[in-house]
Amino acid sequence: MLELKKRPYFTPNDPEFIGSDDAESIQKAIDTASQLGVNRVVIPRINARTQKPEWLIKRTILLPSNMTVVLDNCYMEQCQSAYCQMFTNSLAHEVEGRLPENEQHNIVITGVGNVTLSGGKPNGLLERTSGRNGLPSIWRNHIMYFHNARDIVIENIRIKDQRWWGICFLFCRYCRLSNIDISVIPHVGNQDGIDLRRGCNNFIIENITGRSGDDLIALTNISNKHETVWAVEGRDPDTHDIIIRNVKGDSNYCFMLRLLNHDGNKMYNISVDGLYDVSKPESKQRPGAAICIGSHLYYSFRAAELGETRNISINNISSRGEAAVLISNTLADSYFSNIKTFSDNADIIKTTGLRADLKNVIFDGLFSAGDQMDMLDDTPYEEPVGSILNFECATLGENVVVKNAFAKKLGVAFHLGKNMKVDAKNINIETLGIMLEKGEGSSLTLDGKEV
């Protein structure tokens, strides 16, 4: 044992740790590293047990506090027969893991070189089969899952063909995710890339690339059964102080970034800088929008109220979706700048759903650069389409400001629903159908004059 303590790290290829399967070998190395205070395990490319460049995971690898796992040019895949995550913190699914005093900490998963964590072949565990016919909950089907943990670092890896969400956090804080690539051929439902669920705060998410089968990144704070049962006693349930920057990716019809909160859970102090839609112009499976804020769906007992989604700062966005930004339900005290759409039939900012109440929201620097071509048959539209603001679904707008907006062609510059008060400045559109369509109680002031 003394000789083991002298090693700078352990590997699952060390003879002392080789088990009956790859997950057992890795777990033995991690457990011993933790017990002896070595606290570092390296998973190399070649698997000594099988002499193959792969690690097949049939049970969850449990990570204790103060553990660094280095993935050295390795390929890891979930076995088709497995109904479990690849990595979790060791108390993630334990009852005592719901206690604040059992918060785990200082867990690092870092990749070196070309590292892939794959969901492998689908195992039949889907949202519609979750908990049925002897199957466990779909919440066991992530690649990584962390619950009641802090100071988590995940970096320099590729997530491939996840079976549900790639990386998921619940009641976690002070975490950093960087240099993560999501690579999905959509073949099962709801293949989000990175998900922050209830009770997450103080995250940095940066340098994210790739394509997801659903939302690329989702901040979702709702009180569904799992989020309620596994709530950490006395812990802040809100989502706040999240920094997201330099995201270049694509989503299969959904969103590059979703922000959603309901059921009294608040979302605030979210900063986004650099969200770039890299879908191909000819693609028929573009993201619905670069970013979607809110929804009139998905709540358990009540929708979010005005002021519960606030202090959202969105900068440097480009999109080929039906809108660059979709807003639903509520949004307050927020700022958007340098928002571009390159789609041929898109609105720059659009409300959606049954309701959209906005208060103290500024849109500064909006650009529409589409050529107004029908993507289905490559012919020009007979009439200009799209809007700077398509707020047809809006039900309230107090102190909404739009300034410095530019477009080649638009059908209706401002499409306002009910009770919208919009102040616009410096609007420049080369070819325009009409400036304003408005509903009851709405008005537009353009450069100081009411339209």
What does each model-identified segment do?
Residues 1-451:
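Extracellular/periplasmic carbohydrate-active domains that bind, remodel
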